[in-house]
Amino acid sequence: VGHEHVERCRPFLEAGLPMFIDKPLVNSEEDLRTFVKWHDDGAQFLTSSSMRYCKEYEPYYANHYELGELMYICSPMSKKYETYGIHALESMYPLLGPGFVSVQSTGTYERSMMHILHEGGCAVDIPQGIGMAGAGILMIGSKGSNYIQCRDSYYAFKKQLDLFVHWLRT
């Protein structure tokens, strides 16, 4: 839980130990400022979502030519945006790269809906709520569309940790 990470990580990061921090990194701007300061001071930490490493998504990260230019992505997730929204964001970041220009939240606390626009023109929706099934991406492009589900969570978690260990060694 993000609101506990500053105090839990403080002794390790201030002692110079590298850390992997589970999602979400923070839940407040104040805590984010603390992590930014630690980063700027040379602390080594990594946080990510295992959804970025779903093997079902990987072929599309390398090339999605059969879909053409991505125009719309919908990535429904279960639970609350504050704790699980990062899964949707991380799974689409390798598809779109940097350049998100606007975020609009509609819906309610129980059933959130995030509308995001990327500078490349792709619109993104992330519907979330308790009891809602998720862990997939609907991609609609100029030439086709596809819905892909992440089914092998073991692979995703293992790859995430393997890459963290590689990061530690380099």
Per-range role (PLM):
Residues S105-T170:
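NAD(P)-dinucleotide binding in Rossmann-like oxidoreductases
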Residues V6, E29, K158:
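Glycine-rich phosphate-binding loop at the start of an alpha helix
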Residues L70-M132:
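Rossmann-like dinucleotide-binding domain that binds NAD(P)(H)
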Residues G2-I21:
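Rossmann-fold NAD(P) dinucleotide-binding segment
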Residues G2-H3, L25-V26, M51-Y53, T108-Y109, ...:
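Short beta->alpha connector loops
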Residues F20, L25-G85:
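A contiguous active-site-proximal alpha/beta segment in oxidoreductase catalytic domains
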Residues Y57, A88-L89, K158-D162:
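A general structural signal for well-ordered alpha-helical segments in protein cores
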